[in-house]
């Protein structure tokens, strides 16, 4: 089921649980572009400043509780383009490195 929620920090934007980002004022879905590693990013404006943010981080911050205050997000199915909430999990940096090492041998 598709759901849109306001991002907790970037309050001018709605985040879809599947990985789309929409400007609340214009209603337009923002275009993304990929960084050097192939992860989608988007430019967000807040208080007159523009910041480039990874889409997976916006989805995780909006939809996935983070009671342990981890700062790293892992793509469960190893597809960096699948930014759906069910494919993301918070973890610590060292755990994410273990996942990445394991991925090299899959």
Predicted regions and their residues:
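Conserved recognition-core residues within compact binding domains
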Residues: 1-73, 77-106
């Amino acid at each position: 089921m598709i759901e849109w929620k306001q991002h907790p920090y970037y309050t001018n934007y709605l985040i879809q649980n599947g990985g789309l980002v929409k400007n609340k004022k214009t209603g337009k879905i923002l275009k993304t572009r990929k960084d050097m590693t192939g992860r989608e990013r988007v430019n967000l404006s807040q208080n007159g400043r523009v910041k480039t943010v990874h889409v997976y981080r916006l989805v995780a911050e909006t939809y996935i509780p983070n009671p342990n205050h981890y700062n790293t997000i892992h793509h469960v199915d190893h597809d960096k383009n699948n930014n759906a909430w069910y494919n993301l999990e918070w973890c610590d940096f060292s755990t994410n490195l273990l996942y990445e090492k394991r991925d090299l041998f899959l």
